[in-house]
Amino acid sequence: MKKMKKYDAIIIGFGKGGKTLAGFLAGKGQNVALVEKSDKMYGGTCINIGCIPTKKLVDSTKVLKNKGLSGIEEKERFYTESINNKNKLIGALRGKNYEMLATKENIDIYDGFGSFASKNVVNIESNGENVQIEGEKIFINTGSTTIIPGIKGLKESNHVYTSTSIMELKELPKKLTILGAGYIGLEFASMYADFGSEVTVIDLAKRLMPREDEEIADRA
């Protein structure tokens, strides 16, 4: 039986916190294992599904305005190009984040789903196979998942997207309804309206950006 590999630290999650901590501990001479279940999430939310891709698309809408495109077919083609350009950008950044740690001798990166087998042992499941590693210290940097509201039929629909999945949609939606008038919902509403979608925003609150100060919300 293959001997279980031991580490000074195991970090579950290759996000902003995980990658920074891994680099810091490795710099102190510790042997580090970094576990990530998705090869699309090296570097975390900001790089892959948050700040950078959304701002790249927002910037694309400014280019669209400057080009003066008005026809729906022109806008649809431009939107598809914008999604492809966004994917190229985050792919490059994701690769840089991976190489930044993968090239360090005392960091091992495991692709797979990490779970606790015991207090100091992590089981990593990948492609039907399991590997177990042991760590003196274990850090959890798993982030969060999207919550789908409990509206009847919503989870079963093929036309429901999250803020993550809609940015993979290569065909511009003609009509788009956004549930939630917070800053994320409004960013997507503004962005897709600029691309050419007909957008409706729905929220239980009486005003936009209900979690923000009224002075800020009034400027939305």
Residue ranges and their predicted role:
Residues 3-15, 172-182:
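Beta1/beta-strand and adjacent pyrophosphate-binding region of the FAD-binding site
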Residues 8-34, 185-194:
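N-terminal Rossmann-like FAD-binding beta1-loop-alpha1 element of flavoenzymes
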Residues 12, 35, 141, 178-179, ...:
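Hydrophobic residues in beta-strands of the RecA-like P-loop NTPase core, especially within AAA+ ATPase
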Residues 13, 89-90, 180, 212:
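Residues that cap or flank secondary-structure elements
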